[in-house]
Curated annotation (Swiss-Prot):
Single GO biological process annotation from the record: translation
Gene assigned in the entry: RPS13
Transit peptide start and end: 1-30
Pfam families linked to this entry: Ribosomal_S13
Chain intervals for the UniProt region annotation (Disordered): 121-154
GO cellular component: mitochondrial small ribosomal subunit; mitochondrion
UniProt-recorded name of the protein: Small ribosomal subunit protein uS13m
Biased composition (Basic residues): 136-154
Subunit structure, interactors included: Part of the small ribosomal subunit.
Species assigned in the record: Arabidopsis thaliana (Mouse-ear cress)
Gene3D superfamilies the UniProt entry points to: 1.10.8.50, 30s ribosomal protein s13, domain 2
Length: 154
């Protein structure tokens, strides 16, 4: 098994070096694929991993420390490091799986008809922020009220 994995790793290293130098119909490889997201080649791994939904600064630092990978550019990864990185990121909840989980939790709040669920249903903030003058992100763009007249100028 080890011999097969080692040969797969060397084959992967060769393909990666070819992909760095080869263009296909004028297109170049811009990054590596980790956790169903594209990690750019020209960014350090610590910031590049943050492109994956559900991985922020803290978790990317934890992943790299656990693997013992320094904060180098994504294009400088060896095949073994890339395989280990994909396996490590795969152990955490990320991407579409995390989006589905968050959506189902919000749907559960709406179905239970608790306060937070009703705020989600009406598109209002649910953590106590004021809504009289702010909350534009949640409520959307401000709409003018028809029939409201401006005060006359003196």
């Amino acid at each position: 098994m080890l011999g097969l994995r080692r040969s797969a790793t060397t084959l992967f290293d060769i393909s990666q070096s070819l992909l760095r130098n080869v263009t296909f119909h004028g297109l170049r490889v811009q990054g590596i694929r980790v956790g169903n997201a594209e990690v750019p080649n020209n960014k350090p791994l610590k910031t590049g991993l943050q492109e994956v939904y559900g991985i922020g600064r803290r978790k990317s630092h934890q992943v790299l420390c656990h693997l013992g990978i320094t904060n180098k550019l994504a294009r400088d990864l060896t095949g073994k490091e890339l395989i280990d990185l994909r396996e490590e990121v795969g152990q955490h909840q990320h991407g579409d799986e995390l989006r589905r989980r968050v959506g189902s939790e919000i749907q559960r709040l709406v179905e239970v008809d608790c306060y937070r669920g009703s705020r989600h249903r009406h598109g209002l903030p649910c953590r106590g922020q004021r809504t009289s003058t702010n909350a534009r992100t949640k409520k959307g763009k401000a709409v003018a009220i028809a029939g409201k007249k401006k005060a006359p100028r003196k």
